[in-house]
Amino acid sequence: MPEPDLHCLGGRGLGLHHHQRQQLKGWPDLWLVGDKPSPRARSAAMAPASPPPPPNQTLALSDGLLLRALACLPEPHLTGAASLVCRRWMRLAGRLRRRLAVRDWAFVTHRLPYRFPDLADLELFPASIAAPTALPHTSPLLTCGEVSLTLDPSADPPLGACRFLDDDVLDRGLTAVAASFPNLRRLSATAAAESGGLMAIACGCPTLQELELHRCTDLALRPVSAFAHLQILRIVAASPALYGTGEDGGVTDIGLTILAHGCKRLVKLELLGCEGSYDGIAAVGRCCAMLEELTIADHRMDGGWLAALAFCGNLKTLRLQGCSRIDDDPGPAEHLGACLTLESLQLKRCQLRDHRGLRALFLVCEGAREIQVQNCWGLEDDMFALAGLCRRVKFLSLEGCSLLTTRCLESVITLWSDLQSLEVVSCSKIKDEEISPALSELFSNLKELKWRPDNKSLLAASLVGTRMGKKGRVFFKRKILPAHQRIKGKMLNHSTGAAA
């Protein structure tokens, strides 16, 4: 028989050498048989056993029944508290999620299709921006919507050009999205130099209706023509200052012509920072016969593009946002034409200092029934007087027009016999005491009036119906309820009986 090992653990009267015991002192939770256990081990052994967790009552419910119950929850609870109950609830809540904004590109190619298999609205642009590695973690963030950019306080300017992921990484992610989400309806992504990713989206997502494409160039718009059912398109052109592209990047007449010939079912088109001229807008108007809403923001177009709006035969809404100029050279008025179907003209945060450009805009939109001017610069009396060229206006909204006076406003709106609604907000030079009897009569015939040109008018409007400004005894007169009257009567009867 083999000899017993004298150095084994647990033998009575047998032990380890002194140096071996010293080596085990670094393990406080390990003791030898025959030795005294540590105080921590004794307390753990003497502690009462924890009660078993209560049974999960939802295990008796099928996935289909639980999905119907979770579908009744509003979106914040569905994505928040319900997903934290257990793994099963997290998986089922992910199946009900329809919209998601991704911030980590690694999640796109790995866990996204398993965590949220039925997405219809996917925002990939925030995840396509590469995080800077050289900046410390305490650097401030600049957040705009779903996008957060890291600032470098030591640099001038602190916000440099955005650094995006490599084009092959973007293409692989878009290919994975196309293979996993065939029912995708809306997508926001970053255009790559190669067109493989967007072509995969066009082939794998046949029901895609809305596309938002950032860092666009003329070449990046080639695969957009493959989207057969695209109805809403938002293009953010590549800007050298923000995206770090070359001076020849961006969207010109070439890119506008490409998308016009490919996306003939467009209903809404938004162009941000795009170049181009008469030819590009004319191509969009000729080919996109269903176009109803056109938004042009911060454009860099050449002179003469306003005349091309006459080719948009079904256009109903024209919106200009953040434009430093309208049209430098609109050409003769007889060559401008007009949008006969236009219903709404909206100007937001635009420079309205060019008399020729603004006059050409109102001539093209002379049939507009709704005019909105919000926080625009340079809208003085002589500039706003050009709005009188539009004779069919039914709704006028002015907000933040601090240079406009009451007399000019009256001279324009009295020309509009069809005016039904008027909104004047934060126009400091429009005064209540300057309202003439004719203007008061016009106000009385309106169906809707929102009059808050300054703080004083805002206060006066807010006091209507509150009986504020009356004497204190009238305003603070207590309203006695029937129950109070009964209690008061009982108290009077009781006091009368006691006195008797």
Regions found by a protein language model. Name each.
Residues 2-191, 195-240, 244-245, 260, ...:
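N-terminal adaptor-interaction module of cullin-RING ubiquitin ligase components
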Residues 2-37, 48-49, 131-167, 171, ...:
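C-terminal capping region of solenoid repeat domains
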Residues 271:
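Catalytic cores of nucleophile-dependent amide-cleaving enzymes
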